[in-house]
Amino acid sequence: MTKVKICGLSTKEAVETAVSAGADYIGFVFAPSKRQVTLEEAAELAKLIPADVKKVGVFVSPSRVELLEAIDKVGLDLVQVHGQVAADLFENLPCASIQAVQVDGNGHVPNSQADYLLFDAPVAGSGQSFDWGQLDTTGLAQPFFIAGGLNEDNVVKAIQHFTPYAVDVSSGVETDGQKDHEKIRRFIERVKHGISGTK
């Protein structure tokens, strides 16, 4: 069964909706963005998340110190890193790691010490997709997430195309820039039950 990560949550109501609907991962964005939360805000929201739902912190080109502070203060289960990744960034972290990879047409998949890879559009969180034909996941060492422009209408096709470990959505479950609780529920329902969208 493909797992689901709902990313960019910043309110109690959205976290509760995602958890009750069956999300496997909840993502908190610590990088500058309209979805950014502070460590203190994330720590409060994390109290609403049961142990079987994993808490993910999202960072852009962080230092190891930043990661360790967030892991400690929020109780993160995973860190997801976009941008520059130092060679030793993921070594001996007290939690699992995800390295984000922008799919930009060159088909390059980096050698990574991360536990998981996440394939995203060139501009993460934009709602834009990438050309699925540009990504060959054959022979990958790590389980991988698919992100980038996913929504309730195309997520089943993405799962059929890639057979990923998990799918990741943020803007695809928003209306007017805010998390839409019905869209969160429908997205998870489609993933868990394989119901194709209308488009």
UniProtKB/Swiss-Prot annotation:
The keyword Isomerase applies. Pathway: Amino-acid biosynthesis; L-tryptophan biosynthesis; L-tryptophan from chorismate: step 3/5. This is N-(5'-phosphoribosyl)anthranilate isomerase. It catalyses: N-(5-phospho-beta-D-ribosyl)anthranilate = 1-(2-carboxyphenylamino)-1-deoxy-D-ribulose 5-phosphate. The gene is trpF. Belongs to the TrpF family. GO terms for biological process: L-tryptophan biosynthetic process. It is an enzyme of class 5 (isomerase). GO terms for molecular function: phosphoribosylanthranilate isomerase activity. Keywords: Amino-acid biosynthesis, Aromatic amino acid biosynthesis, Isomerase, Tryptophan biosynthesis. The keyword Isomerase applies.
